[in-house]
Curated annotation (Swiss-Prot):
PANTHER family: TRYPTOPHAN SYNTHASE ALPHA CHAIN, CHLOROPLASTIC, TRYPTOPHAN SYNTHASE, ALPHA CHAIN. Pathway: Amino-acid biosynthesis; L-tryptophan biosynthesis; L-tryptophan from chorismate: step 5/5. GO terms for cellular component: cytosol. It catalyses: (1S,2R)-1-C-(indol-3-yl)glycerol 3-phosphate + L-serine = D-glyceraldehyde 3-phosphate + L-tryptophan + H2O. This is Tryptophan synthase alpha chain. Belongs to the TrpA family. The lineage of its organism: Bacteria, Pseudomonadati, Pseudomonadota, Betaproteobacteria, Burkholderiales. GO terms for molecular function: tryptophan synthase activity. Keywords: Amino-acid biosynthesis, Aromatic amino acid biosynthesis, Lyase, Tryptophan biosynthesis. The keyword Cell membrane does not apply. The active site is at residues 53, 64. Tetramer of two alpha and two beta chains. The alpha subunit is responsible for the aldol cleavage of indoleglycerol phosphate to indole and glyceraldehyde 3-phosphate.
Amino acid sequence: MTTTDRIAAAFARVSEAGRAAALIPYIAAGDPSPQATVPLMHALVRAGADLVELGVPFSDPMADGPVVQRAAERAIAQGVGLRRVLELVADFRRDDSVTPVVLMGYANPIERMGQRAFAQAAQAAGVDGVLVVDYPPEEVDEFAVMLAEAGVAPIFLLAPTSTEARIEAIGRVARGYVYYVSLKGVTGAGSLDTDDVARKLALIRRHVHIPVGVGFGIRDAASAQRIAAHADAVVIGSKLIETMEQAGAQAGADQKNEAAIAAAQQWLHTIRLALDDVKRENAPA
């Protein structure tokens, strides 16, 4: 199965199972350690993840809140950069050729590697999609083509402030899915207005004809269920990372990785069980 096929197949499986929305956890590659990342990814899949978003650690993550920033700092302190992240994806692919992996990060590491070299390396590692937070769609046509030619989906963010013209522009170039940021500000901040999200998704779907995932502000089963009634995917990161962080802090030095992985799997499974009970509000009768 090729990389972009995996994303489409994942959403198709969700639909065929009669589920309202896919579950997409976000973790920072290299946190709590590089050695724990691949086992953690497999644990998330066992817990019910349909896709996995893997954050590429960066020293100046402007869109990330304090929880995700701390995770990136821990990873960077252990020497994890873009090349190591690609190695981790390749390691994951040895045992899982089905679950899509999407890299989420910033332009600087990609620019240092070179856009074309990165696109080719991402495809070789088994990356399915790439979301670059600080690449506006109107400036990355060439890069999006490079990714698409390599079979890697260029994925874009939309926000509450996105104009209809911007939504239309992203609808033309995005592949895989679009990530709607449900709150203004950084990850893990603010409170969720589900009605506002539903209204914005209705506008987005006029111009975007691929799945739309929603993230930011989803911190528990109840908020995940509310979003799943409207979105094609629920993206959840800060609370998951915080859960791992707390479990690792309470464990002995030689048990931090195992404790973090176990806590992540247990917590994410509760979210998956909650999502399995949701019916899409705008689904046909």
